[in-house]
């Protein structure tokens, strides 16, 4: 019974971080992440998932404030988004090749690995989705240069392990 109980993650076991993505240090990027299974995409070194054993995929909750976006990034893993609440705009690709689609709750969105993506809450209430990434490894975001440079100007970067840190603690490239 205890072993089964450890594999059930109710909302009271979620550890939300509003500093889970490098973009979160920038205005207009009010996102929060709560890992559930595996280490997922979080860049907050303090976060630990309730279920950390390998499953072949990672699961985490993503929450965006009204008008906020994750910022343009890509990861190596295939990703599926289960949109639970809110109105979303999903943007694929960069620069002149961008394609955006508006989607609503109760929708599933598939994003191929290495595809640039930006998720935006276009509604007036908090938007929430469940994010599933393929593989057991932690997903490491490759941020659009604009995001990385703006974060560095704000005094933030990522350490060698890909976790957010104050720029004055980093000795090399800030992101």
Model regions and ranges:
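Double-stranded beta-helix
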Residues: 1, 116-175
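Conserved short histidine dyad/triad with adjacent acidic residue
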Residues: 38-48, 58-75, 113
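Glycine- and acidic-residue-biased ligand/ion/polar-headgroup-sensing regions
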Residues: 65-66, 76-89, 93-94
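Histidine-centered metal-chelating micro-motifs
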Residues: 68-71, 89, 108-109, 113-119
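Short acidic-glycine-tyrosine-enriched beta hairpin
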Residues: 80-82, 94-113
